[in-house]
């Protein structure tokens, strides 16, 4: 996190595929999308991420044509599709339930859309088999859905969605019904398939890890509004506000008070009772309240014994959890605040552990912190 870990931002050369401008949507008189503008680029894997009820699925359904906008405009490849019926939008959707026809074989499920489009009969078999090969199911063509695993059914749904070569594929929480191991496998397969096909994917999820793993770009939503739009690394390491910081992964939030500005980048501040320098990229005044944000893996801890003195935030180990590659500890500061620390095991160093109630000093690399204004005291 913070300044020293920022990426070099490269200008995007991608061309817009979908443009939503001034979108507004109400249900039963309640405004769920108040004013939304969003551009989705050709060939990217974009994820709409947010808690239940944030409006992400509504945005997906508006793009698909399954809901109509109350105001605003939707463009697809520079064509206004705001009032174009769903079946004429060259957009396909994969739902959480997959919605396979149980009485049809895998082949017939995938061929269904082609038959509905009156595709010439001679083209159907090669196109269906090509789609099944893409998802590694060509040998399952004559099976029925009930003879497939959940992951295989999911891949059939994707094959059915891509067989007619849509410009855009929408996926609505389409991995959430799978078990953990299969979900991880399908995340990798979906991303690889998207690269292979070159089709733009828009994926809806509330699972932060899923979004970070699969996406070229993440749009974080709350209450029908976009809170932040950026790459997974930007969203994780440079959250724009406390909502994004708290929603994406674990994060520690320390209270701070400005003492003085030292230079263009650094501020001297009191952070949870300890004076230190922090990097602040906006104007501040002495006495102003701030939040200093640090991921558990960005903290450094040192055991304090009776015969040594250590600088930093002082606390005591209250919980520790071995996670294989990491040791996660909960440290209670002297003021009562709980801090999560994640330490990685290095195979070249001896293993370590901390006893409960062990006294600890917590520090971090200067400039790795993200500093935000206190939203209650702006």
Curated annotation (Swiss-Prot):
Keywords: ATP-binding, Cell inner membrane, Cell membrane, Membrane, Nucleotide-binding, Translocase, Transport. PANTHER family: SPERMIDINE/PUTRESCINE IMPORT ATP-BINDING PROTEIN POTA (PTHR42781), SPERMIDINE_PUTRESCINE IMPORT ATP-BINDING PROTEIN POTA (PTHR42781:SF4). Residues 18-248 form the ABC transporter domain. The complex is composed of two ATP-binding proteins (PotA), two transmembrane proteins (PotB and PotC) and a solute-binding protein (PotD). One of its GO terms (cellular component) is ATP-binding cassette (ABC) transporter complex. NCBIfam families: potA, PRK09452.1. It comes from Escherichia coli (strain K12). Changing residue 54 to T: Loss of ATPase activity and transport. It comes from the Bacteria. GO terms for molecular function: ABC-type polyamine transporter activity; ABC-type putrescine transporter activity; ATP binding; ATP hydrolysis activity; nucleotide binding. Induction: Transcription is inhibited by PotD precursor, probably only when excess amounts of PotD are produced. This is Spermidine/putrescine import ATP-binding protein PotA. It catalyses: ATP + H2O + polyamine-[polyamine-binding protein]Side 1 = ADP + phosphate + polyamineSide 2 + [polyamine-binding protein]Side 1. It is a peripheral membrane protein. It holds the Pfam family TOBE_2.
